[in-house]
Design a protein with these regions (language model features):
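Exposed, low-structure sequence patches enriched in small/polar residues
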Residues: 1-379
Length: 379
């Protein structure tokens, strides 16, 4: 059909394995329709079935891009699914499957969510984007349903699906209902843009981006069990050019639950931790922080800095120069009531999408962990 595209993954990439669902299939397609006035809409159905827990979930999302000059859209999501307890994500689907099948490790933990959400997004001024959403959901804890692994390691066992009680299948939280409202303002300083017939396109800015976010859990309406107010502020810059010395990137975020009368774990403020040898590169990712144990329903401050020397040192070494390696150093920092002054330092090398780093983690100036980390993908 004219001006229509359908994107669908291969069945191979849709297969997965974890200890909650066992072997499972997660399959979704994206149908996009474009119009002469440069407006478009996209429909995204998805189904998922776990063979061990015998659970079928399905959901449907849609987005309508109705004003390309104002970068405006409206959308919805409805259905249910199996989701990571950490809404920032932990491991990729492939890494989760390989760790469970080959190494008897089930790092990610999951829960079931049934939901309906409406959202909107629009440019309010050049460089200033506003977004809002309202959603109603029912959330349920899940248990493991299989302990199959190709190799059986005598010194380890799979842990439960509760990260705080790894030896017992106790629910992390009761079944609860939530009515949530989210709003955010994102502003990029010195934002330049280009207008074409098919829309308004932002150009990379030399200045940072700030984001103000507010989340509210509305109690009592539609039997909603949650009751909280969260406000957060983030500032980031993905590429700060330093000439021949390379480039840097930085992210800092702070937030506080102004009211936390009823906050269940999926609603906590989460962080991008890492329990594995491998991880996708991300300026917000810690190298050694647990995925779940330090999520908070109080206040926090996190900061991340990384500098890539872009071959400044390795290019001076005749034999190494041909490898086109890039040197990098970085620091990650977190403080919150349960994890005060946690700091990571790391250094490493990178070649295209593959990087190897060695890091040290300190908790209140006491070294608590160190080791190698391998990352793949683009940051």
């Amino acid at each position: 059909l004219k001006n229509t595209t359908v994107n669908y993954p291969s069945l191979l990439t849709s297969a997965l394995y974890n200890t909650v669902e066992g072997f499972a299939i997660k399959y979704g397609v994206t149908y996009t329709k474009s119009f002469a006035n440069r407006r478009s809409y996209a429909i995204m159905p998805e189904v998922r079935y776990g063979f061990a827990n015998k659970t079928l979930t399905a959901n449907l999302s849609g987005n309508y891009f109705y004003d390309p000059l104002k970068r405006a859209s409206a959308g919805f999501s409805v259905g249910n699914g199996i989701y990571d307890l950490n809404n920032l994500g932990t491991m990729s689907q492939l890494s989760t499957s390989l760790n469970a099948l080959l190494f008897e490790r089930n790092f990610p933990k999951f829960y079931k969510r049934t939901f309906i959400t409406a959202r909107t997004n629009r440019e309010l001024a050049t460089g200033l984007q506003g977004a809002a959403s309202v959603g109603y959901a029912k959330s349920e804890s899940l248990n493991n349903h299989t302990d199959f692994s190709v190799f059986d390691f005598k010194d380890r066992n799979f842990t439960s699906n509760n990260p705080f009680m790894p030896g017992a299948d106790a629910p992390l939280f009761p079944v609860y209902k939530s009515l949530n409202f989210n709003a955010s303002l994102t502003y990029t300083f010195g934002q330049e843009y280009m207008i074409r017939p098919d829309g308004k396109f932002y150009q990379p800015s030399k200045y940072p981006t700030i984001k103000l976010n507010y989340r509210k859990g509305i109690n009592g309406v539609l039997d909603s069990d949650v009751d909280y107010d969260f406000i957060g502020l983030e500032i980031s810059k993905d590429r700060i050019n330093m000439g021949l010395a390379g480039y840097s990137q930085v992210f800092a975020g702070a937030g506080k639950f102004l009211n936390n009368k009823a906050v269940y774990f999926p609603e906590f403020q989460h962080f991008r931790g890492n329990n594995s040898l491998t991880a996708s590169p991300d300026i917000r990712r810690f190298l050694f922080l647990d995925y779940y144990l330090f999520s908070t329903n109080r206040e926090y401050l996190e900061a991340h800095f990384e500098h890539n020397f872009a071959g400044l040192i390795t290019n001076k070494l005749p034999l190494v120069r041909k490898l086109k390696l890039e040197e990098l150093v970085g620091i990650n920092y977190l403080t919150q009531p349960l994890k005060s002054n946690y700091t990571e330092y790391y250094f490493g090398i990178q070649r295209l999408f593959l990087r190897a780093t060695y890091g040290f983690a300190f908790d209140k100036n006491k070294q608590v962990e160190h080791g190698f980390r391998i990352s793949y993908g683009f940051n």
